[in-house]
UniProtKB/Swiss-Prot annotation:
<keyword id="KW-0597">Phosphoprotein</keyword>
<keyword id="KW-0812">Transmembrane</keyword>
<dbReference type="GO" id="GO:0061178">
    <property type="term" value="P:regulation of insulin secretion involved in cellular response to glucose stimulus"/>
</dbReference>
<feature type="region of interest" description="Sufficient for interaction with KIF5B">
    <location>
        <begin position="2"/>
        <end position="421"/>
    </location>
</feature>
<feature type="compositionally biased region" description="Low complexity">
    <location>
        <begin position="61"/>
        <end position="77"/>
    </location>
</feature>
<feature type="region of interest" description="Sufficient for interaction with STX1A">
    <location>
        <begin position="314"/>
        <end position="421"/>
    </location>
</feature>
<feature type="modified residue" description="Phosphoserine">
    <location>
        <position position="557"/>
    </location>
</feature>
<feature type="modified residue" description="Phosphoserine">
    <location>
        <position position="400"/>
    </location>
</feature>
<dbReference type="GO" id="GO:0031982">
    <property type="term" value="C:vesicle"/>
</dbReference>
<feature type="compositionally biased region" description="Low complexity">
    <location>
        <begin position="225"/>
        <end position="245"/>
    </location>
</feature>
<comment type="subunit">
    <text>Interacts with STX1A and KIF5B.</text>
</comment>
<feature type="compositionally biased region" description="Low complexity">
    <location>
        <begin position="35"/>
        <end position="52"/>
    </location>
</feature>
<dbReference type="GO" id="GO:1904115">
    <property type="term" value="C:axon cytoplasm"/>
</dbReference>
<feature type="compositionally biased region" description="Polar residues">
    <location>
        <begin position="168"/>
        <end position="180"/>
    </location>
</feature>
<feature type="modified residue" description="Phosphoserine">
    <location>
        <position position="111"/>
    </location>
</feature>
<dbReference type="GO" id="GO:1990048">
    <property type="term" value="P:anterograde neuronal dense core vesicle transport"/>
</dbReference>
<feature type="compositionally biased region" description="Polar residues">
    <location>
        <begin position="85"/>
        <end position="101"/>
    </location>
</feature>
Amino acid sequence: MGPLRESKKEQRVQHQEKEISRSRIPRLILRPHRPQQQQQQQNKVSPASESPFSEEESREFNPSSSGRSARTISSNSFCSDDTGCPSSQSVSPVKTPSDTGHSPIGFCPGSDEDFTRKKCRIGMVGEGSIQSARHKKEPKGGIIKPGSEADFSSSSSTGSISAPEVHMSTTGNKRASFSRNRGPHGRSNGASSHKSGSSPPSPREKDLVSMLCRNPLSPSNIHPSYAPSSPSSSNSGSYKGSDCSPVMRRSGRYMSCGENHGVKPPNPEQYLTPLQQKEVTVRHLRTKLKESERRLHERESEIMELKSQLARMREDWIEEECHRVEAQLALKEARKEIKQLKQVIETMRSSLADKDKGIQKYFVDINIQNKKLESLLQSMEMAHNSSLRDELCLDFSFDSPEKSLPLSSTFDKLPDGLSLEEQITEEGADSELLVGDSMAEGTDLLDEMVTATTTESSGLEFVHSTPGPQALKALPLVSHEEGIAVMEQAVQTDVVPFSPAISELIQSVLKLQDYCPTSSASPDESGADSMESFSESISALMLDLTPRSPNSAILLSPVEIPFSKGAMEAHANRLMRELDFAAYTEERLDSVLSLSQGSVVRQYWSSNFLVDLLAVAAPVVPTVLWAFSTQRGGTDPVYNIGALLRGCCVVALHSLRRTAFHMKT
């Protein structure tokens, strides 16, 4: 049979189906003539007990509608998501009753024009109240799309068994779709068509059945125009019903695909099975898990960064703490050093203060020794004057023999004067030893002054004991003849503890001394002369030249010293050897006074020119010798700079510090 004939038969079948049901929406049509015989036969043929399937499947596979029935799948089953899984809200496939005459519910037949205009419409008739209830739940239909897949019952999750269904499309191209049977049995389309033989078919049904029986499993009909639809990827049931004969479809395109009649296709996510929903949920959860893991990794990385930053901050803090502790320790050490330095400074100050005190005490001791030396010199001068006066008294006594008694008394006192001079010499030697002693007490000065006062009083006794007028007459004669230099001494002391008590002591000592009663003059005259001389001696002895400081005094002793020139030089050399006191000589040079007999000339050179020339030119000789010896470049020179300086000091300085005093007569 050619393809043209087959296409004609298909058009007839489609036209009959279109006449039966042109719309998916069920319409109740009252049929007044319904044969009861066919209804009874239908009830006998399809009892619920004979069907191995469920009650719903026995209704769906009723043999009374086998000839002209065409199974349809709701339009919701053809909507799937991007994974190819059908929706979960799809209903199980239902069959449209082929015989409208035997069904109480029918559809209005349409004309051929409606058939050509609406090829995508599929009629569906609900069987009984269950089918009508299903259609009430799904009032809206969709357009059958090409390449539709087999739908699964929503009761597949509960374990119900759905029969294999084959849908024959009424559009221009027919596609065969195989459904998976999740039950233990599978039915073929041929079996259902053979079962429908019990009902008296119409002539059109006979042609359709004969066509299906003729080519149930012929391999010639299964060519590329017949292709099974791809099963669902999410269904885990075994592929049952694959042995059923495929439904023929025509390789063509829809003539009016874009005519949706105002019906919008629903979202594919609304038509997923629970398993597919689980898979989608798992996918979403996996994506969320990945996102949470990514966030977790980010948080962990941030935590690690914060931990590393915290570790760095901790290290920095520890380092700063170490620096701070080191600084504190260094500060403590510095404070300790400062304290030690302060202690050292205090000790140095105390030691310096002690040294200053010692130096001041040393200066005081030096001044005390100076006072002792001054008093010693004065006592020596007084003793020498007394010895000269004793000699004059002796000469005068030899001239007057009647005065033997005073002469004897004078001789008796003369050894005392000589012994006094020896005692003064010994005291000078002792004072030379006491010059280097810096710890001498200040009380020694008072003792020495008392001793000097006693010696002076003894000297004055000799003066008073001698006849005053004769001695005074003889003294200028001798001094004029022999050309003796007369000098007035004035020695200033730095600190002399002068008080009225000392002067009173001296006066009392002098008053106790008796003058000599064996003078040639009368006692009244001698007493008057002695009193005059006593007052003059006291006034000459103690004279205050510094009224600004009442505790310091200058001892001025105008004593006439009749010497010869050689005796004067010998006495000066003896004093220089014993004392070597240059300051005293300088003070003597400053205190030279002019007298009425003549003028005193200050000279720094000696009377002999050769001596002065030798004193100046003597250091030149070792200097020249030293210069030649150093330029000669030989061994060690005979003279060095030390020898030169020593020679200069020995030769020149000793001669220069000796001073001679001449008086023009």
